[in-house]
Amino acid sequence: MLKSSSSLVAKSILRHQCKSMSELYKIHTLLITLGLSEEEPFVSQTLSFSALSSSGDVDYAYKFLSKLSDPPNYGWNFVIRGFSNSRNPEKSISVYIQMLRFGLLPDHMTYPFLMKSSSRLSNRKLGGSLHCSVVKSGLEWDLFICNTLIHMYGSFRDQASARKLFDEMPHKNLVTWNSILDAYAKSGDVVSARLVFDEMSERDVVTWSSMIDGYVKRGEYNKALEIFDQMMRMGSSKANEVTMVSVICACAHLGALNRGKTVHRYILDVHLPLTVILQTSLIDMYAKCGSIGDAWSVFYRASVKETDALMWNAIIGGLASHGFIRESLQLFHKMRESKIDPDEITFLCLLAACSHGGLVKEAWHFFKSLKESGAEPKSEHYACMVDVLSRAGLVKDAHDFISEMPIKPTGSMLGALLNGCINHGNLELAETVGKKLIELQPHNDGRYVGLANVYAINKQFRAARSMREAMEKKGVKKIAGHSILDLDGTRHRFIAHDKTHFHSDKIYAVLQLTGAWMNLDVDYDDQDNHCFCS
């Protein structure tokens, strides 16, 4: 019992809601001296705040729980949940094992977060073991657990197990349907995902977002936008950040600037919070759609305090891709002044900028800075350095750089070197690199074409023809390139030699007229002399 002289003060301390860990440390120390550190509601509040709060410390929660003379069951669930959301989800499994050693039985609130940890760890074996434990504990048809299991199997790309569980469930709710839809979408099976989507009698924003994201991840961007349009027409669900990021991504890949602007206006009209992720997506979309001014406008309006490395990367990379090389490098220095730490992608953007601008000295500086920052250069960083050197005509240096790399050269590295050799007239090295490329990627049509071009430039026409013969022998077919033009909201696709475009007669007529004005002796009806459209 509390002493009457201090009961009011003690009760006040026990009920105090902490707002920071430093405050919690002080109160905990005080209660230890008073012998009240295991009293409620301090125990439950301490475990809840330290394990689940964004400003908490789940390791502290675990230590606190372990030292209690009679740790409550809910405390174990709090700590397991906290670790499942942390940078160390494997610790939740350790807590679970210790819980079992104490003879405590997991309940319907324990398993879902253990399954979340197994998903984050990509541990299929662990997930299967947890499922077996659920069955043994008699919780196999708990709706919360079943929905989490479907989501877990989906994260493992195991649609079969997810579907089997879905079909066997005696009761389903909207979360169940969303879970199986997301499982199919994550695995890239958008056909099955769409069948589930069409079968659903009820949909919410998660449903629509999963279907849209599934199409985006499969590269079916037009279908993603069609689903979004359907969502808007039905009006039953308001799009959220996840929805809009996927929609913006689709616009970016399609180069659909007008559509992207419409989406941006929608975000503003419905007062959707312009989070860092949304702003970064908009910057990336505008840059990829050729409107660097709009990209800059989005970035400029953002408060520096609300930015992160990803947003700075998007605008730095966007400026560089549009030829604003010096501006992108200056912005990097501004980024450092703003106390935003660059990451590996930042240096990749900077190296790409140096490549476009022919800035060899600066590229070496950034490449060395990346190493000095403690990060290990990835394949993409090495590829950028090869591109920088090759574009600048330093093809021998690029070749030496590749030879001294601690990783094996990729097709993109050798491809950049090959282009540099061709552009700067080193045909001997070009032939050597071209042959290595074919060995590395024997089914890539572009590698044969690249070496054929080397032979043609060197007037070795027989060797050039042999490349086509080699392609035919290996069954490699040249994939026709295409261009896309967005005109007044309508997308026009142009492919070599094709005349299926609904205005092809008029287009060819204009080409003939243009050729005549330019005194070009070209027959646009001769497929051997031109590449055209559909």
From Swiss-Prot:
One of its GO terms (biological process) is RNA modification. PPR repeats lie at residues 41-71, 72-106, 107-141, 142-172, 173-203, 204-238, 240-274, 275-305, 308-342, 343-377, 378-408. Residues 489-519 are annotated as: Type E(+) motif. Residues 413-488 are annotated as: Type E motif. One of its GO terms (molecular function) is RNA binding. Keywords: Repeat. Belongs to the PPR family. PCMP-E subfamily. This is Pentatricopeptide repeat-containing protein At5g08305.
